Amino acid sequence: MGDKAGTRVFKKSSPNCKVTVYLGKRDFVDHLDQVDPVDGVILVDPDYLKERKVFVTLTCAFRYGREDLDVLGLSFRKDLYISTFQAFPPIAEERKANSRLQERLLKKLGQQAHPFYFTIPQNLPCSVTLQPGPEDTGKACGVDFEIRAFCAKSIEEKIHKRNSVRLVIRKVQYAPEKPGPQPMVETTRSFLMSDRSLHLEASLDKELYYHGEPISVNVHVTNNSTKTVKRVKISVRQYADICLFSTAQYKCPVAQVEADDQVSSSSTFCKVYTLTPTLDKNREKRGLALDGKLKHEDTNLASSTIVKDVTNKEVLGILVSYRVKVKLVISRGGDVSVELPFVLMHPKPTELPISRPHSAVPESDPPIDTNLIEFESNSFSQDDDFVFEDFARLRLKGMADDEDC
């Protein structure tokens, strides 16, 4: 039997090791027309279960204040969405076809394992973390998704950390396959005591950029006025629309260039400036929007948010966008500036895990998918097909161990 890569499965157990949750992935992609389903398996010790039921909840929450300020029953957190699934005993009308991964896990784990399934609504925001300050402790502000599994006689029963499993997943978006048109903007400015005007034209080399990719800004100035351009300032700005009780917008420069390029009266000027917005140069900026964090992985600037219906006022959370600002500093005449919107995202991975009903797979000659279980009748040890990885969340500075998800 040749060597082959096993199927990665993330798992996390309760502190008392009586409840364990298994998931095939941690990132669930928003494709705009639908979101990847959240399907997993929960394993419960039968001696511990007794007469109780098994519940799994999916919560999307927006934390908008420091955790240490949660006093007197007041919490700076708003639950945007809560869904509950009763895994055992199963409810007939909630039963759905198991995915291939669920079928394989159920076969491996035995009769004490139970499948669960959630559908994430499309109007929920993507996972975004607001960068904490040096003195901030506890959970960072932002939007996150959490799965919680526990045993109880009813859903209203108080849940204890010792016998429940909490793990954080992410709702993410990837760059569209077809980028938009090349951004270009122009403006003309007239000045007092000057018969002629100044014309500024700016453009980007494309509309879609991947994280870490340099941005080329083409600046063309035709100065027919009597004024002189003293300096040129180029900046990349992140805009975060906080949509909760009301809508507020916060902007933060993430890359900037200032050049002493002068444009005299009755002359033209053309130059390409290059900027690369990265988190490494902005780690001290409190409140900067970042992609949601998982495990012990570093993150990056928050990806641009793509909204399917821009007129939908029910979208809550943090909506992120980016613009390049080109500013000309004029001698004794004020400033002339334009803005160019662009999209900053991760490319779509070549192979994404896909959750499909087991019944949808043909019985003969199934397509090979490295992200799914391969059913083999001649396998000596099907257990070797699994690579279990503990499910953990990036531990922020000052965060207690029991909050590590």
From Swiss-Prot:
CC annotations in GO = cytoplasm
UniProt xrefs under Pfam families: Arrestin_C, Arrestin_N
Full protein name: Arrestin red cell isoform 2
Specify the species.
Oncorhynchus mykiss (Rainbow trout)
Q: Which SUPFAM superfamilies match?
A: E set domains
Provide any one GO MF term from the record: angiotensin receptor binding
Q: Does the keyword Cytoplasm apply?
A: yes
Its BP terms in the Gene Ontology are: G protein-coupled receptor internalization; nervous system development; positive regulation of ERK1 and ERK2 cascade; signal transduction
Name the protein family.
Belongs to the arrestin family.
UniProt keywords, alphabetically: Cytoplasm, Sensory transduction
Q: What is its main location?
A: cytoplasm
Q: Reply yes or no: does the keyword Ribonucleoprotein apply.
A: no
Q: Which domain of life does this protein belong to?
A: Eukaryota
What is the annotated localization of this protein? Answer: Cytoplasm
